[in-house]
Amino acid sequence: MSANKKCRVLVVGAGPGGYVAAIRAAQLGMDTIIVEADKTGGTCLIRGCIPSKAIIHAAERFENLRKHSAEDGHMGISITGDTNIDMAAIVDWKDSIVNRLNKGVESLLKAAGAELIKGWATFTSSKQCIVETEEGSVTIDADNIIIATGSSHIDLPFMPCDEEFIISSTGALDLQKLPKKVAVIGGGYIGLELGCALSRLGAEVTIIEGMDSVLAIMDKEIRRPVEIWLKKHKVVVHTQAMAKGAVV
């Protein structure tokens, strides 16, 4: 089933750049269509800031529980019995937060009067594109087009992600089972966020960083508390080290 649509503004990509532009264009009275192949909200909402903070929050809760489960307890509070991790349940909880916020973005688009079409857009000219959706193709002619497609992670050529043993940051947010050991390539804020969360949950974590320190582009005053935390939690850090490959 195919359809044809015309609009004054077409936005391709419903991340924070795209959906805000679509909402504003619609608020100003322009016929607006926004196209997105994934969920609305972009990296921050779907596979970045928000889901990672959810995992981190769960990890902090678990770490605090383990303090109270220690032999002498913590602050005079003791919890008897085992404290266990259900990684799949944590991921489900994280996904529920993402889905709720995703629906919020879709509601904002609808309230502003912007039409959301879910699918992949292919341009046939500077003013026209064809969107492949689950229901069929939609041809859109637009007076103005905003391209806000964002980006994706880059695989290391010698160590491509298979999302089973070698995983991207996106895959790390969808782990169904906590790994016993994890090597994190890159000691920037994304690698450290995920590495610290997995360490709190009980994994043995090693950080591999090519520069002379973790968070190398940040001030020493910011790095120092992180380095202290890593040492305290027995996270192994190799600086000025380059990963060359992996054996699975």
Regions picked out by a protein language model, each given a short descriptive name:
Residues 2-7, 23-30, 35-178, 211-215, ...:
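Glycine-rich flavin
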Residues 3-15, 178-188:
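Beta1/beta-strand and adjacent pyrophosphate-binding region of the FAD-binding site
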Residues 8-34, 191-199:
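N-terminal Rossmann-like FAD-binding beta1-loop-alpha1 element of flavoenzymes
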Residues 10-12, 33, 147, 183, ...:
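Conserved hydrophobic packing residues within short motifs/helices of P-loop NTPase cores
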Residues 176-218:
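Rossmann-like NAD(P)H-binding beta-loop-alpha module
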